[in-house]
């Protein structure tokens, strides 16, 4: 009685100033809570976290939602001494089935991106699943753009390890996931 969790192996490649990390795998998700067991007010993987706060606005607490977790990580190495600005584009290729699990209006999934200990709920995120109906099983691709300023430590050849976790709160499963890291070097002139 828990959601599916999958850790993907990843590859990291460099082309110019762009690091590209791809994690390809398939994860089939388990609805939570199981039908017939009544409402649940806790996230299956985070007992201290209520569903309402984990799922964000617009998702009813206790609804039968799939709560998958897909974790990928890699090292972004940088040898220049400068500020680093990291722009991450996350490409999602997902399949959707039975979005409207409990008669709720079909809507895009609320997507929770967790980076380290920081959590950010992205509302109105792509993909939008436009024109899809209950029971449809289609694939779509969307992009999520984030700009991160990384000045916590001086860049070094040892690299900076990053781990991201994607949590979907609707009935869908991830087909593939790829992330592109672009490093822009900003030099300070004294």
Curated annotation (Swiss-Prot):
Protein name as annotated: Spermatogenesis-associated protein 12
Native organism: Homo sapiens (Human)
Gene, per the UniProt record: SPATA12
Free-text tissue specificity from the UniProt record: Expressed in testis.
